[in-house]
Amino acid sequence: MLRVRCLRGGSRGAEAAHFIGSRLGRAFTGWVQRSLQSTQAAAASQNRCAAEDKAQSPAPKECPVCSYNEWDPLEEVIVGRAENACVPPFSVEVKANTYEKYWGFYQKFGGESFPKDHVKKAIAEIEEMCNILKKEGVIVKRPDPIDWSVKYRTPDFESTGMYAAMPRDILLVVGNEIIEAPMAWRARFFEYRAYRRIIKDYFNNGAKWTTAPKPTMADELYDQDYPIRSVEDRHKLAAQGKFVTTEFEPCFDAADFIRAGRDIFVQRSQVTNYMGIEWMRRHLAPDYRVHVISFKDPNPMHIDTTFNIIGPGLVLSNPDRPCHQIELFKKAGWTVIHPPVPLIPDDHPLWMSSKWLSMNVLMLDEKRVMVDANETSIQKMFENLGISTIKVNIRHANSLGGGFHCWTCDIRRRGTLQSYFD
């Protein structure tokens, strides 16, 4: 086996560079010296971030990524794009995560664009959302536009893409680290490409960058005979711990995790398996504790329309999907709020989600929340809690599968690492 020894900086590194250069020429000497300088600079930047994280102090400007929870003052965020959004092919994992009334839509339009007029309106809504975030003092970054209609093939499957609309699904920020999730839908296999420019920039400025093991998405990852004929079937299967994804290899969507300082809560869902959860648990230990919680939910996918933590010891808990472990939160002194019934009309298309996007809100800090302009009931709920509402209409953007929390990934919040669940 070929073994390669890294040259470290300092006097020994310089001597090694000189020795190699004398053997292989001046060009190589220059390359080695530049490599040493680059490595030393990157290490120094990385060490600054690591030291700041351990010291539990806010990351300074040198480290652009720093977020420990869902409510500290928001300074920088990635907001997704609806441009070029395509309907995913109607594969078994898509079928398991969507409502039967839309199956014909997927069968007919899989691989093609979502209705263009609808997407155009969604684009305009998200642009307005970005403008409002900027007015509130938040730095906004956007993923690159990509043609998602291009068909691709791996040794295990072929598919077209979907979109880069929901950064919450693919990116998870924990402290000064940004983690790319190994998502479970084949149509999302190459979604990371839209974010690479942004993440490389964060990395070059000192942030940690981790990519979880990429799943092959071979047929073995999915229960090809997953029975989903009715809502009753889904309830039984979820109660039995049976999902369309198997334990063949790790997979998870970042949106199945929600952060509260040292404690991170996750659900086993149609897109997040126990192998994926265990990978995260080992990766984040010992500084963070990963807790598995569950709900009475016939079709679990993404925790933030079921259980959305909006402040220290303050959580929105979906009354239609009660948490089986809710007493643990109450014993820990948390306040559990049941949000009101959503007001979204029955005839509004929701191709990938439920009406409970109303509770999928984005906290700008403990006293400011971005909420849908049409959802007057939940606005009143927040006002009664002493939280001012920033109202934005993203009704057409909702149709693509997300609310404010889904459409964003908070990159930097001004705060420190604390425990809220002791």
Swiss-Prot record:
It catalyses: L-arginine + glycine = guanidinoacetate + L-ornithine. GO terms for cellular component: mitochondrial inner membrane; mitochondrial intermembrane space. Its EC number is 2.1.4.1. The keyword Ion transport does not apply. InterPro entries: AmidinoTrfase (IPR033195). Pathway: Amine and polyamine biosynthesis; creatine biosynthesis; creatine from L-arginine and glycine: step 1/2. It comes from the Eukaryota. Induction: Transiently induced by estrogen, with levels peaking an hour after hormone injection. The modification Phosphothreonine is found at T416. Keywords: Membrane, Mitochondrion, Mitochondrion inner membrane, Phosphoprotein, Transferase, Transit peptide. It is found in: Mitochondrion inner membrane. The active site is at D253, H302, C406. Residues 1-37 form a transit peptide. Its main location: mitochondrion. GO terms for molecular function: glycine amidinotransferase activity. One of its GO terms (biological process) is creatine biosynthetic process. Homodimer. Catalyzes the biosynthesis of guanidinoacetate, the immediate precursor of creatine. Creatine plays a vital role in energy metabolism in muscle tissues. May play a role in embryonic and central nervous system development. PANTHER family: GLYCINE AMIDINOTRANSFERASE, MITOCHONDRIAL (PTHR10488:SF1). Belongs to the amidinotransferase family. This is Glycine amidinotransferase, mitochondrial. The gene is GATM.
